[in-house]
Design a protein with these regions (language model features):
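Non-heme di-metal
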Residues: 1-168
């Protein structure tokens, strides 16, 4: 859940779609994929029915493999260090560069990114760090898992970003 420009409740995914469409990005593939997930109730089957780049498929597979471990400390670590602790700083740099382009149609995208920065940086990030500490406690094996899987999450995210960068 989130709020839009007029402070109305909305779905964060809808903010993403609106911001992408405003800058002229084609959102048909993501909409088709989400529709396939809903219809199939199985992400792997939905992937097979969708035109998704291998880099994105690999990233999704890694994500679902982590979920399949059913180990809360691993799932939380990957989420925290592969996303919550990382993305706000990245988005701040994107927002700064977009703000420097006069006349661009980036208001919706800026709003979407700023919402991420606010939610992830101010609220989710600090809470996630406390959660990891609580889940791992004094168990060195859990901390080792957290480090191992978080490092792999970063590698997977870099591979995805490298692909995205090559397509821009």
């Amino acid at each position: 859940s989130d709020i839009d420009h007029q402070e109305n409740p909305t779905i964060h995914y809808y903010l993403y779609l609106e911001s992408m469409e405003t800058i002229g990005a084609n959102t048909e593939k993501i909409k088709k994929f989400v529709s396939n997930v809903i219809d199939c109730n199985n992400y792997k089957l939905a992937v097979s029915k969708s035109e998704i780049p291998n880099a994105a498929v690999d990233f999704m597979n890694f994500t679902f493999d982590i979920i399949d471990t059913k180990k809360t400390h691993i799932i939380a670590s990957v989420f925290t260090f592969g996303r919550e602790d990382l993305i706000p700083d990245m988005f701040i740099n994107i927002v700064k560069s977009l703000n420097e382009k006069p006349g661009s149609k980036t208001n919706d995208l800026l709003y979407y990114l700023e919402r991420h920065i606010e939610m992830d940086g101010d609220e989710h990030g600090p809470m996630a760090l406390k959660m990891i500490s609580g889940l791992c406690g004094n168990d060195q094996e859990k901390w080792n898992d957290a480090i191992k899987y978080s490092n792999e999450a970063l590698k997977q995210r870099i591979k995805l970003w490298d692909y995205i960068s090559s397509q821009i």
